[in-house]
Amino acid sequence: MNIEIAGVTRRFGRTEAVAGVDLSAGPGVLGLLGPNGAGKTSLLRMLATVIAPSSGRLRLLDRDPRGYAERKQIRRRLGYLPQQLGYYPGFTVAEFVEYFALLKEMPPAGVGRAVAAAIEATGLSGQARSKLRTLSGGMLRRAGIAQAIVNRPDLLLLDEPTAGLDPEQRVAFRAMLRDLGERATVVVSTHLVEDVGAACGQVALMDAGRIVFCGTPAELTTRGDGTDAAGDAPLERGYSAVLAAARAAVGARS
């Protein structure tokens, strides 16, 4: 397994953003679904080794990220697109992606080819020499995706990756995700149910810091059968039904 999490929590002061999560994942595309404030971004930042768990056990790519040397090895095999990625407006797209390739300590001889491949995969070949400050929001997001995949990561973490993409770009992105999931573990954090249904083989649904469902999109869909859960599509109704049941259970316990 490329991700192994047991009893992981993350607190910020008195707020418990992630509350005892258990999760494992191998190659494939996992959709991390949930409403805003569910804890998705905090969990993704722990998987990206940006922040450490407050408690619990976390192993990534068969390594323990608590040690500096192990964490460095993980980061060489990791791709991460945060929700808010800092861009250097004076860089061209190619320079921006190359900068991240060098940060990931890729062998210099292969950087040029890797940068070109990542830019092509995200549909930005025509903008490779364009300054970032001249790009639209959707193009900037694609440049962010390019830096995340430039090292052909074994673990790819994407936080709201389709934000700013138009419908055609989202379709192309979902196809790219499916291809990447053939060999790598891809975790996509989103609140858009349709992205999960189109690209993900597995779904983990978070609410109030906990994972309240883990299974396939088809299994999530069946949770809405025979209910009056809100949603225009079957998967949306399954999502709503699971959230309602989880919140009702919390209310009953309290």
Which residue stretches match the model-derived regions?
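Helix-to-loop junction immediately C-terminal to a conserved catalytic motif
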Residues: A48
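Conserved ABC transporter NBD signature motif
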Residues: G56-I74
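Conserved ABC ATPase "signature" region
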Residues: E98, L102, A109-Q127
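Conserved ABC ATPase signature
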Residues: K131-G138
